[in-house]
């Protein structure tokens, strides 16, 4: 059983005029009924209230609409927009007019009816869903909308709200009170503008007769209503929509013309990731000489003053490395600083020669079979002795030079006193390879006549390859180390001199002095410590 209780009307005769709701015959069939109140209304001026309902399946009775009473007229009020403004101004809350639907026998619509209640004031849209057993009444519903003098006459609907030719409207209307938990704000799709039959139901509106901006229901500034939320309206009686720019996009306020944005200027220089033209094997040795990652990449065609300065600094850094790689033998320690350094460097930190003699390099292998014959001459001639030599080779091919051999002759088998020699004389050390062929004969002259008892010292004998004609004043950077002999001397408490500890040798894989085609010749240099020259025994 269906029952609808209608709101009693104060007058039995319908009033003609603008207070009559413009009800069309097809509104009942289409399930859409609209009420309109002109400007100057006392209770709810400028208000549309639309109710949409869905009848149950199989219901085909024609519906009739109740007429809405005309609200008493009242003087014009100040234009207020937005919910809650009337309450702040001290105005009493107002109730909009309602429209109801009745069946043929005065009965309401059946069970399962869902109604949607629309009030067009500041785009306030509320959906009401009734319960299954609730009866439909024409009670009033007061949205928190302030009064307005401007009456907007365009119904917000969609194209699918047109009347159904078959007489079964998919949408109907029947306003009524609903529980607060069943009020839902509809999606912004219902705010899209539509034209009824291609025309507006009212030609003009108040406030100077300005018209509502007409747009197609599917577009709003080139965007669909689903993706375009309503924005703040213009200074007119009706709100409008504005396009929202995507995130990260800023409007161009300087010019209205559309065109390509100006190209941003790129950075001047980047950061290098590796050396330009370097030996891959030498990276571990002279990587500290290369420019850091913050230095710019050098362009070969760059002729600017900055480019010339950078290339000049690069040449200063790499010049000692080029001379280091060109040498055929062992090289003297190169200068790692681009500024000029003294000809004689006394530092031993990081020295290639000292590192080899002290065993700081990891050996790559050992060779057995080398021997050394030791002899001396002077005030007396001690007996010659032959001792084995422990030969170790190293892999220093990143220096682009022949890998040297380190030979160590242990003198401990000769006793605690070592190999006795005169205080002034010559020491001869002959090195033999496993085939018993002479590799090199060293002759070292010494004079330790002023050496006190219980002291010690050493001699370091070097053989360099120097350019021909520069024997006397050869530049240390032009000398190539070929052989080295390190001897340790010690004086006993009685004043006798002897070789002790061990004898260390550095030699090349091949005999460089036999290569007559090289424009170099051998030069022997013997060095001893000074200041102090002798050190006391521990």
Swiss-Prot record:
Q: Which UniProt keywords apply?
A: Nucleus, Phosphoprotein
Annotated region described as Required for macropage invasion, given as residue ranges: 348-430
Q: Where is this region: Transactivation domain 1 (TAD1)?
A: 436-444
Question: Where is the major localization of this protein?
Answer: nucleus
Question: Which cellular component appears as one GO term in the record?
Answer: nucleus
Q: Which residues carry this modification: Phosphoserine?
A: 254-255
Which residue windows does the record flag with biased composition (Pro residues)? 227-238
Query: Which superkingdom does the taxonomy of this entry point to?
Result: Eukaryota
Recorded family membership: Belongs to the ATOS family.
Domain characteristics, as noted in the entry: The protein contains a transactivation domain (TAD) which may be required for transcriptional activation of a subset of target genes.
Q: What is this protein called?
A: Atos homolog protein B
């Amino acid at each position: 059983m269906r029952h609808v209780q209608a709101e009693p009307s104060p007058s039995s005769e319908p009033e003609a005029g603008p207070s009559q709701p413009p009800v069309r015959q097809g509104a009942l069939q289409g399930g859409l009924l609209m009420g309109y109140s002109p400007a100057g209304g006392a209770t709810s001026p400028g208000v549309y209230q639309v109710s949409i309902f869905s009848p149950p399946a199989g219901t085909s009775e024609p519906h009739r609409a109740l007429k809405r009473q005309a609200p008493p007229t009242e003087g014009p009020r100040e234009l207020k927009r937005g919910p809650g403004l009337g309450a702040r101004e001290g105005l009493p809350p107002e109730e909009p007019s309602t429209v109801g639907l009745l069946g043929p026998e005065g009965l309401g619509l059946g069970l399962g009816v869902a109604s949607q209640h629309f009030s067009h004031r500041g785009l306030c849209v509320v959906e009401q869903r009734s319960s299954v057993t609730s009866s439909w009444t024409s009670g009033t519903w007061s949205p928190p909308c302030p009064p307005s003098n401007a009456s907007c006459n365009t119904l917000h609907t969609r194209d699918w709200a047109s009347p159904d030719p078959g007489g079964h409207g998919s949408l109907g209307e029947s306003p009524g009170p609903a529980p607060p938990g069943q009020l839902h704000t509809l999606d912004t799709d219902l705010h899209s503008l539509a034209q009824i039959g291609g025309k507006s139901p009212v030609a003009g509106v108040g406030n100077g007769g300005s018209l509502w901006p007409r747009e197609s229901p599917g577009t709003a500034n080139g965007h669909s209503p689903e993706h375009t939320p309503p924005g703040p309206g213009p200074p007119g009686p009706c709100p409008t929509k504005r396009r929202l720019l995507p995130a990260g996009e800023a409007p161009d306020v300087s010019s209205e013309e559309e065109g390509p944005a100006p190209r941003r200027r790129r950075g001047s220089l980047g950061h290098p990731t590796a050396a330009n033209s370097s030996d891959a094997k030498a990276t571990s040795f002279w990587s500290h000489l290369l420019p850091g990652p913050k230095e710019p990449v050098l362009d070969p065609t760059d002729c600017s003053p900055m480019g010339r300065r950078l290339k000049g600094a690069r040449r200063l850094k790499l010049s000692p490395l080029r001379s280091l790689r060109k040498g055929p033998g062992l090289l003297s320690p190169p200068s790692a600083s681009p500024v000029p350094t003294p000809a004689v460097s006394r530092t031993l930190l990081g020295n290639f020669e000292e590192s080899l003699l002290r065993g700081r390099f990891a050996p790559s292998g050992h060779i057995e079979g080398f021997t050394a014959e030791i002899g001396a001459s002077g005030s007396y001639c001690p007996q010659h002795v032959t001792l084995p030599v422990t030969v170790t080779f190293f892999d220093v091919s990143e220096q682009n030079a022949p890998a040297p051999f380190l030979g160590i002759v242990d003198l401990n088998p000769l006793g605690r006193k070592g190999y006795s020699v005169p205080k002034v004389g010559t020491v001869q050390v002959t090195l033999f390879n496993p085939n018993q062929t002479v590799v090199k004969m060293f002759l070292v002259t010494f004079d330790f006549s002023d050496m006190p008892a219980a002291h010690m010292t050493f001699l370091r004998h070097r053989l360099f390859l120097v350019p021909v004609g520069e024997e006397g004043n050869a530049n240390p950077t032009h000398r190539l180390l070929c052989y080295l002999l390190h001897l340790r001397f010690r004086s006993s408490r009685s004043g006798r001199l002897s070789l002790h500890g061990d004898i260390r040798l550095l030699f090349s894989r091949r005999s460089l002095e036999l290569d007559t085609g090289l424009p170099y010749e051998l030069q022997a240099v013997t060095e001893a410590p000074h200041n102090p020259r002798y050190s006391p025994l521990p």
